[in-house]
Amino acid sequence: MAGNTIGQLFRVTTFGESHGLALGCIVDGVPPGIPLTEADLQHDLDRRRPGTSRYTTQRREPDQVKILSGVFEGVTTGTSIGLLIENTDQRSQDYGAIKDLFRPGHADYTYEQKYGLRDYRGGGRSSARETAMRVAAGAIAKKYLAAKFGIVIRGCLTQMGDIPLAIKDWDQVEQNPFFCPDPDKIDALDELMRGLKKEGDSIGAKVTVVADGVPPGLGEPVFDRLDADIAHALMSINAVKGVEIGDGFEVVKLRGSENRDEITKAGFQSNHAGGILGGISSGQQIVANIALKPTSSITVPGHTINRFGEEVEMITKGRHDPCVGIRAVPIAEAMLAIVLMDHFMRQRAQNGDVTTTIPRW
């Protein structure tokens, strides 16, 4: 199975399945001399881990990360960093009844078509459980980018179903179980989630992730444009069906005179481009949105076929998220951090000595 690695100089390779013994990853390209402990990684893992509220899956995994290599006496050595998280709360028996069925909306059918077999326990490698290691690796990138360049990466839920959520207060995001930046909508989200759990159904969501403090110059035209790599990274997250950079699909409504981000001595007058022009960071805030589909693991009966080609009705039992968008927030942050870290290293390798007299804001 290929496709387990992202990045060129800052490289993250993950392994493991939902109901396997453990999840792990190898992080290559981490600069030496960075203070790093397991506690530095645990904060974001705790934000992502299951079972932390009644609105997410009740699979209870502590997600305690272990640093196996690449750190000596509390600092990175420049060698590969090995990370491991043990699975402790698998309930594989929940999936015995569907081992021969293809869950509609899941990767069961496509995995079996591709490989001729599949791990039916919790989706195996296709499960979002794999993203725990992305978050751990992303925490390394976030720490370095913040300490070295003052870059702040943060995300929030900006829509659930038909409820839009304005970014009113970033401080509120960590104060509620929805990563919601609009305190006036918490009750509406709670009511929606309670109704979904009662019905045994699920709902889609939109997540926004931003990076402040990114300097101009990151991105490798033409095929490794910064926005192309960000879209690639975000699109690789489970359940993501759409990615927008800046205004995204809203630009189809605008005229060129409205969409262009005009520049004065005071700086850019707007940011429709989401901080990226020509595939290169402009120095403005980088903004990306992702759309996540409603999970298909629901107790509402649905139609499918089994491995023998017979039509059957099925209900997906187990412990699942009514809205996968909630726990996607720290995952999106991690993927943006990984891409920015990789492009920082690539920029430094080729253009580390480049200086200009062009203003920066």
Swiss-Prot record:
It catalyses: 5-O-(1-carboxyvinyl)-3-phosphoshikimate = chorismate + phosphate. Reduced FMN (FMNH(2)). One of its GO terms (molecular function) is chorismate synthase activity. Keywords: Amino-acid biosynthesis, Aromatic amino acid biosynthesis, FAD, Flavoprotein, FMN, Lyase, NADP. Its cofactor is FMNH2. The keyword NADP applies. Pathway: Metabolic intermediate biosynthesis; chorismate biosynthesis; chorismate from D-erythrose 4-phosphate and phosphoenolpyruvate: step 7/7. SUPFAM superfamilies: Chorismate synthase, AroC. One of its GO terms (biological process) is aromatic amino acid family biosynthetic process. FMN binds at R125, S126, S127, N238, A239, G278, K293, P294, T295, S296, S297, R319. This reaction introduces a second double bond into the aromatic ring system. Homotetramer. This is Chorismate synthase. It comes from Klebsiella pneumoniae subsp. pneumoniae (strain ATCC 700721 / MGH 78578). The lineage of its organism: Bacteria, Pseudomonadati, Pseudomonadota, Gammaproteobacteria, Enterobacterales. The gene is aroC.
